[in-house]
Amino acid sequence: MFKKLHYKVRGLPTPLAGLALGIASLGWCLENALPLAGWGQTTGAVIGLVMIGFLVLRFTAHHDTLWADLKHPVVGSIVPTFAMCLMVVSKTAGHWMPEAGVVLWCAAVLLHLAALGIFVVNRLQEPRLELMVPSWFVPPIGIVVADVTFPEVAVLLPFAKILFWMGAAAYAVLLPLMIYRLFFLPEVPNGAKPTIAILAAPASLLLAGYLTVEKDPSLLLVALLFGIAILMTVVIYFAFWRLLRLQFSPGYAAFTFPMAIGATALYK
């Protein structure tokens, strides 16, 4: 029985971390719309934590799958959602145990930065623009989840602002490249097409992160991010007409977080 479970765990898809992130974020977002007294956020965080717990089992029992994922041009860009989910969980944990929440937040940020570094190194070894897919936004810009979940510790605020500007700079560089890749290079493979939904996330995430850590936000920057966020979200809603007709795959997890963070940014 243990041997059977051992091999079943090996088959867990890495995009499960993206789904965990989406569920945890959705639970938090629902707190803005419904009088849930914190239970929506807590429920989403617990579900997300259980889901990434299964991935921890997989990575622990099968180290080779983690390294294979990190080297893959698509799956490797999804791995950081594991750390992003932990950041969202840290916000919930902070309500009950503030010190534990800060420690978890710091650990998740360091984990994300490590995944980002590995992703960049692997991609520089094979710098082909046709391999680029929208999930490539996740490693450099997903770090801004650290700003959205910032634990309100004054000494960490400068670091959180640096993380925001890192994400903003990466978006400014990657967005034109991504648009060029999608319009002028070979079509994204069917297996990676669900990641197109991620296009809706970066501007919304940057907007939510900026409004969280900046007490005196620039109206121009807010208007710019808001405009891009709305445009990208509307485009992806129309794209769902085709994306939802694709054969189901774990990549469908890419549909969750972009919608949740878009709603969160609007509430901000």
Model region roles, listed by residue range:
Residues 1-56:
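N-terminal signal-anchor module of multipass membrane proteins
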Residues 2-25, 62-88, 105, 121-148, ...:
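Juxtamembrane helix-loop boundaries in multi-pass membrane proteins
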Residues 28-39, 91-102, 148-161, 209-221, ...:
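Helix-coil boundary and interhelical linker segments in multi-pass alpha-helical membrane proteins
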Residues 34-102:
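Membrane helical hairpin/interfacial module
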Residues 39-53, 98-113, 158-173, 219-230:
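Structural signature of hydrophobic alpha-helical transmembrane segments
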Residues 115-119, 148-149, 173-182, 205-212, ...:
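Alpha-helical transmembrane segments in multipass membrane proteins, preferentially the mid-helix core
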Residues 211-259:
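Glycine/small-residue-rich hydrophobic helix-like segments
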